[in-house]
Amino acid sequence: MTEQSPPAVRSLSHVSDWVFDLDNTLYPRECDLWSQIDVRITSYVMEVTSLGFEAARELQKGYYRDYGTTLNGLMQRHEVDPEHFLKTVHTIDYSPVLAHPELVAAIADLPGRK
């Protein structure tokens, strides 16, 4: 058997902007942050529409299906402020996400805006 050399690392200096999808990308799925957010989205729909839990949940999933995101449905149908929605539904317990200094350093070392 011959030993293979590591793959060549391409320069990333041409990248000017980075966008990171946080959900299960920069933290492990086991943190289960989405379940907290999902419950808060349902609560938000309940507040905006004055519906009970089951009806709000059904509407939430319908907006997701019909508009691509629940937020888009709420904006189109209820004139919801997206900043208020995002701040509200992301006010969760982040303690399941453990510190990962190597990841922080790797992202900091990337060129461009993050």
Where are these regions (language model features)?
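N-terminal helical cap/lid subdomain that shapes the substrate entry/recognition surface
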Residues: 6-20, 25-104
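A charged helix-plus-loop insertion that forms the helical arch/lid used to bind
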Residues: 2-3
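A structural micro-motif
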Residues: 80, 112-113
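A general structural signal for well-ordered secondary-structure junctions
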Residues: 95, 113-114
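Catalytic-core regions built around general acid/base machinery
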Residues: 102-112
